[in-house]
């Protein structure tokens, strides 16, 4: 993995937050789809 110098100096937290938001989005979408199909 290359480490590019980041002018904003943002840590890994941004990637971690986007990862958690993606997992939350997939989870909510799965729950809504399952409730839609089972009703």
UniProtKB/Swiss-Prot annotation:
Its main location: membrane. InterPro entries: PSII_PsbL, PSII_PsbL_sf. One of its GO terms (cellular component) is plasma membrane-derived thylakoid membrane. It comes from the Bacteria. The keyword Membrane applies. GO terms for biological process: photosynthesis. The chain crosses the membrane at residues 18-38. Pfam families: PsbL (PF02419). Disulfide bonds: none annotated. It is found in: Cellular thylakoid membrane. Keywords: Membrane, Photosynthesis, Photosystem II, Reaction center, Thylakoid, Transmembrane, Transmembrane helix. It is a single-pass membrane protein. Belongs to the PsbL family. PSII is composed of 1 copy each of membrane proteins PsbA, PsbB, PsbC, PsbD, PsbE, PsbF, PsbH, PsbI, PsbJ, PsbK, PsbL, PsbM, PsbT, PsbX, PsbY, PsbZ, Psb30/Ycf12, peripheral proteins PsbO, CyanoQ (PsbQ), PsbU, PsbV and a large number of cofactors. It forms dimeric complexes. One of the components of the core complex of photosystem II (PSII). PSII is a light-driven water:plastoquinone oxidoreductase that uses light energy to abstract electrons from H(2)O, generating O(2) and a proton gradient subsequently used for ATP formation. It consists of a core antenna complex that captures photons, and an electron transfer chain that converts photonic excitation into a charge separation. This subunit is found at the monomer-monomer interface and is required for correct PSII assembly and/or dimerization. This is Photosystem II reaction center protein L. It comes from Synechococcus sp. (strain CC9605). The lineage of its organism: Bacteria, Bacillati, Cyanobacteriota, Cyanophyceae, Synechococcales.
